[in-house]
Amino acid sequence: MGKNCSTDRKKELGIVFRYLMYFTLAVMAAGNLSFDVMANPGRDAVSILQQNCVGCHGGFEVNGDLDLTSLRNSRHLRKDPELLVQLMNAVSDKTMPPEGESVLEESVRQELLHSLGEVLRQVEFESAVMSDGVARLNRFQYNNTIKDLFELKIDVFALPEKLMTRHEPYLTGGNGVMPERVRVESLALRPQAGMTNVKSFPKDSRASHGFDNQVDVLTMSPLLLDAFLRLAVSIVESPDFTAEKVGVWDELFSEKSENTTLEEEIRKRLAVFLYRAFRRPIEDDTLTRYTNYALSHTSRGLDLTESMKKAVSAVLSSPRFFYRSRSATSGELSFEIASSLSYTLWGSCPDGELLKVAANGELSDPQVLRSTIRRMLKDPKVERFMDSFPVQWMQLEALMAVTPDPGVNRYFSLDAQYPATVQMVLEPLLLFDGVFVENRSIDELISPVFSYHSPFLKSWYGEKLSPPSVDEQAINQENDLRSKAIASEQAIVDDYNKQLQEVDTAIKNPVISGLVEADLVAGQLKWEDSQAKQSKGELELSPWSKIGPFRANSLDDAHKTAFVDEAAVDLEKQYGDLRWEKADDLVDGKIHELREGNSAHYVYRTIRTEAARSVQISLGSDDSFKLWHNGVLIGQKNMVRGVAPDQDKFRLELAAGENEILFKISNGVGGYAFYFQASAIALPDPVTAALKIERGNRDDNQRKVLSDYYLAIAPELQEARRILNLKKDELIREREVVQNKLNSLPKPKSVAAHRDDAQRGFDNHVRNQLRVREFDRVAIEDPRYGGIITNAAMLSMTSGPKRTHPVARGVWITEVIFNDPPSPPPNDIPPLNEEDGPKDLTIREKFAAHRENPSCAGCHSKLDPLGFALENYDITGRWRERYMNGREVDVTGTLMRTHVFADVLEFKASLTSESDRFSRAFVSHLLRFAVMRELTPQDEIIIDTIMDRTREDRHLMRAVIEEVLYQSVQ
């Protein structure tokens, strides 16, 4: 083939088993070639290989450790079927001859493929598809088997590997049409809890490029065996293992019937359970052993229910339960077929009907086998197949660990509990559901006409994904209006403040303010003389007199209504049925209870003093109160409150002689009370010191101290101050109205604040979208999106935190779409250093030098066109035309050295033109899932058969699944 062949045989030949016979069959059907294969199968293949390939794979130069010089006839090829398949794949995939060498003419390539295929069909394989061996139940299968055996209404343990939870039975409950709207969600990051006190064994490993049900990875270590044994006991001992949650409780665990002996009852129950648990007929000695085990517990005093639990946990601890044998012996083959079908489609043990046809040996009848598979596809338990195969085939579990750099896209992980992954993962799974339910061609997984989108996905694909812009001009205009309104009201408040300052000044000295004419000198002299007498006498407080309750319509009514002569109290006067009464029990300094709702009480007393003096009155009330001194209202509050001491305090200037105190307490709903305490106010020390000095001997400062103090307490100014305080209260109330209006006015808000509000609102909008469960069916109007390749799930999980990974995307396509996984890179090849080189290089340009390494070129020539074709999608699957450095995205390439494309639409069209390759790859994946092992050259013939039988209808999903299941148990 030339001198530049790769030195890695596996890379050159594309190690996988796929894509081979379609080309041969197509050519034969077209009648374009004439082959004499019956006379000498493989003769043409040997001839073509010798003419075109020995140059690189023979003589002094043996590239890829493949020497074809000894190849003389087809017998050499039949001896090495794996090499035979590798040659077919390399030629079919056009990886051979390598780039830079002469390309085989299409007719020659087709002739070579056909001849190699005929040789493969003549290989005498030793084993059947259902090979001998055992397979342990994986977590998913174990959970489902336990649920079905006991008809449990909850999962045994949490299953984060279940990526989609369907809230409607649309898979089998409709008429072959998916609903326009479905309710689904992904609970993978917050899985529903299983049974209490039940701990699962660790999550199962994935086979390389495979599934979690593969025999070679489902091993059993001593630690894992111990976990299985503990699990079996914990299930039946769980508080959730009750008659309410176990559907077979009555048949398996209830107390025995009166018509049988205890041994007969246990034996009867265990016979049914063992048959289903072991999934095959049970020997008498096995049944007897478990029966005796249960009886041993009843003989120790346990009741039948607990004894059956012990026996059942022993059954679940048996390898015959948690292992699936793969025996090809005729006696149990039907039951192995039943288990294979059941665990493939239902992820669980066979049901009664499946065991029945197995016991009757009917599964060997092709018609019965096919009808059985079709029945199983219609059973609701097929949802478990949809929960396992599509997820693992598309490698979607990798998506759940994706965490893009918030600096690149902040919305992906905006909600830690509901990241974008829980929405994205549902799109490809719903597409698979739709193709299955509507039995569409599997080609539509690549190029569908519909998809299912949530509001979040609609925004993700179609919108700018940013908050709405703000109108700076409108904001500034609005701020001007707001500022003017605030300034207007603030001017009024300022005017009130000015008036209040003037009133406060007048209250301090009403004489200077001109509000009253009074000779304070005479009053001060009289007051000074009285202070000498004050020290010789104490306050004389009369007992309280009380009248009430006076009923009213409301608290406000009770507070405002004058039920007695409040300015001139007459203790002899009667008011209706009420009269003043002595109340010797009302002691100062205590809270006194009153009765009646919506009413008022009055209490009255006198305070006698030989000289004018100051006292402090401390009040408490439930609810409102008014206080009069010598007929003058000196304080009031109209409110609802509970009583407490010292809620309000007043300074009272008592005149020499007798002073009258009237206290009104008003109540709303319920009981009420009051508190009263009077105490003399000591003179300030400077005043006391000045009074001790003879009047003629006082200095200016002492005279000022006394005049200032008297000015503050002068009885001559009391009325003026009362009026001024009323005016002050009115001004305060009026100012409060304006201030409240001012406070309620919207404040100017900066443009930056508006942007922040818009961002917060948009963030909340996105958070709400991330929690939506409803997905709507939408037509694919934008051909850039749709299908299992160009969706946010696949594109996100094949990217890094900060940039896309074209190679990872290429690997995903070769593995998932073409079932052609590349060889791992050589150990001596360093990874790409993204920090090297100029910052303005594109990722394609950075990879250019990497691809120049001969050890890398082979794989990269296949992977790079696939990965770079998707570079218009950023790390989260959103469309972009340029990189962050401003450079345009270049997606041009060639698919399989045949299909040249300039954009992603042409790339997708190229994939569609290779639909038969995809179909064959899909069948290969599904067959591997069904047989639970890596495929062999023999399986290539099985795949040919499946492809042939489903090709006419374009490989309809249900037909493909049926045929794969049918062939997998032959």
Which residues make up each language-model segment?
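Beta-strand signatures of extracellular beta-sandwich domains
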Residues: 626-628
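Bacterial N-terminal signal peptides
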Residues: 19-32
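Low-complexity, glycine/serine/threonine/alanine-rich intrinsically disordered linker
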Residues: 40-66, 79-86, 90-95, 99, ...
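Short hydrophobic alpha-helix segments
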Residues: 637-638
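Short structured motifs
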Residues: 587-591, 602-603, 645-649
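N-terminal secretory signal peptides that target proteins for export/translocation
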Residues: 1-17
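Short beta-strands within extracellular/lumenal beta-sheet-rich domains
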Residues: 597-607
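Boundary at the C-terminal end of the N-terminal hydrophobic targeting segment
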Residues: 29, 35-41
